[in-house]
A protein has these predicted regions:
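Nucleotide donor/acceptor-binding cores
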Residues: 59, 140-142, 296
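Residue-level signal for inorganic ion chemistry
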Residues: 13, 131, 420
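Rossmann-like S-adenosyl-L-methionine
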Residues: 151-184, 188-464
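Short, solvent-exposed loop/turn elements at beta->coil junctions and helix N-caps
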Residues: 46-54, 121-123, 129-134, 231, ...
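Upstream accessory/linker segments immediately N-terminal to the RecA-like ATPase cores of bacterial MutS
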Residues: 73-74, 80-104, 108-113, 117-166, ...
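Local cysteine-cluster metal-coordination motifs and their immediate loop/turn environment
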Residues: 2-18
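Short, low-complexity Ser/Thr-rich regulatory SLiMs
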Residues: 65-69, 135-137, 229, 445, ...
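Extended interfacial segments that mediate partner engagement and assembly in macromolecular machines
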Residues: 14-120, 138
Length: 464
């Protein structure tokens, strides 16, 4: 039995054909083989923690518009395996919640019916680029954003319209056993080229999605429906302006009793239930109850919407989150306020630059007194010396200079969270050279059916 209709062609999954228990064993052995030769001293690997859900676990998906073959009908979904251009219709993908598949299908059918073209990577023309869908696991709130190019007549090319008409004619032929005449087809092309504005097009799309909810076809409900302009030539989602078509531009998710406000572009773990397992393990590793400092200063670097910062705040005097995406920082501040947390501070900036500025300020004024909260954000991001550090960097890990600055703080213990184990493996070398040793290490399967896995390492500085 196939995992999904695109099992042989899609590059999204890796372990569809084997039992989940076997997948976990493979991932555990990969982590063991990667770190065993690198870790100095005892090898404290604790194995892998399974995901609470094996499918329908993803709370975020980024789908692409395109076609499966040159000049084929409009497709919306994921890239074909080993292909930069070909897009597969993936509304039956089993990684996200089924609500996302229904939204995906409704969106594709709507724009196919309107004869709207996708953005061609080579010709740099066309309208439709990506569809971002996020859904709260605990709240059921759904946030959808259509990412598109500048609206122009080329968005409705004759080829695109002919393709949409051909699809409609096939449907009519199967349903009514009749075919549209050539003259009628030509007339329809002309009508489609002139009858709709961007405002009307987007309004119609929004209404087509809302009808899913009104007709009871979704388990969740829409928090917001948005559209985002992206005129960049890069094949990536670039936010050059987002407008609300319905509702609001954020939704809420709950983790470990806390509320988190999330926008289309906020970093947030894509497996909410798995994230709870991850963060529970981080709190266990931190175990600040028996430290010399009763209420430590904690740094959460690459903090996203401030999830770890807030979860660590209950054992901290002050917890500082540093994140480069300003939108995520604003969400983090709002999240902390809504959760009634008063000892969190969030700084918008690149981790390397913030640490360099802090180092320069400390050199000028001498070491900043422990716990001095005089500020920080208003006074050049000056931060007190941390007692404990958590880093959760992007997939490629930390910049070497940022890691050097973290090491220079000389904290007794730090936690490194890695969504790409090889990045942690690379960064272990300078950390161990500076006297840190891995005291605890585990993997968390945040991405079932894929070959990705999260790792957590607790490092402690040896006494010289």
């Amino acid at each position: 039995m196939n995992w999904c209709s695109n099992q042989e062609r899609c590059g999204g999954c890796y372990y569809q054909e084997i039992p989940y228990e076997e997948e976990l064993k493979i991932k555990e052995e990969e982590i063991r083989s990667l770190f065993a030769p690198l870790v100095m001293g005892d090898f404290p690997f604790e194995g892998i923690i399974s995901s609470p859900k094996k499918e329908a676990y993803r709370n975020k998906m980024e789908f692409s518009f395109g076609d499966q073959e040159k000049d084929g009908p409009l497709c919306l979904g994921l890239h074909q395996k080993r292909s930069f251009f070909n897009i597969l219709n993936t509304e039956d993908c089993r990684l996200p919640h089924p609500d996302m598949g229904k939204i995906l299908l409704a969106t594709r059918e709507y724009f196919l019916d309107k004869g709207v073209g996708y953005f061609h990577k080579k010709r740099h023309e066309g309208y439709l680029r990506h569809l971002l869908i996020r859904r709260g696991e605990k709240t059921g709130e759904i946030l959808v954003s259509l990412v598109h190019n500048l609206f122009a007549e080329k968005s409705f090319s004759e080829q695109d319209i002919l393709q949409s008409l051909a699809v409609k004619n096939v449907r009519q032929e199967s349903e009514e056993n009749c075919v549209t005449e050539t003259g009628g087809e030509a007339e329809s092309i002309q009508d489609k080229k002139t009858f709709i504005s961007e405002e009307a097009l987007l309004k119609g799309w929004c209404e087509s999605l809302l009808s899913l909810e009104k007709e009871g076809k979704l388990d969740g409900h829409f928090a917001g429906i948005l559209h985002t302009k992206n005129e960049s030539l890069a094949d990536a989602v670039v936010n050059q302006g987002t407008e609300i078509l319905y509702g609001k531009d954020f939704f809420y998710e709950k983790l470990l009793g806390l509320n988190f406000k999330i926008t289309s572009f906020s970093f947030f773990q894509t497996n909410s239930l798995g994230a709870e397992k991850l963060y529970e393990k981080i709190r266990e590793y931190a175990d600040l109850s028996n430290t010399a400092v009763e209420k430590p200063i904690i740094f959460d670097l690459y903090s996203g919407t401030g999830t770890i910062t807030q979860l660590m705040s209950e054992v901290a005097k002050e917890a500082y989150g540093v994140e480069i995406i300003e939108e995520a920082v604003e969400s983090a501040k709002e999240n902390a306020k809504e959760n009634g947390i008063e000892n969190c501070r969030f700084i918008a900036g690149d981790v390397l630059k913030v640490l360099e500025q802090n180092k320069a300020a400390m050199n000028q004024s001498g070491d900043i007194a422990e716990g001095n909260s005089a500020n920080k954000e208003e006074n050049g991001n000056i931060l007190p010396r941390p007692d404990f550090i958590v880093v959760d960097p992007p997939r490629d890990g930390m910049h070497k200079r940022a890691l050097d600055l973290i090491i220079r703080y000389g904290v007794n213990r730090l936690i490194y969270v890695a969504c790409k184990p090889k990045s942690l493996a690379r960064d272990l070398e300078p950390l161990q050279a500076a006297g840190y040793r891995v005291k605890r290490l585990c993997a968390v399967d945040m991405f079932p059916r894929t070959n990705n896995v999260e790792t957590i390492a607790l490092l402690q500085k040896e006494e010289s």
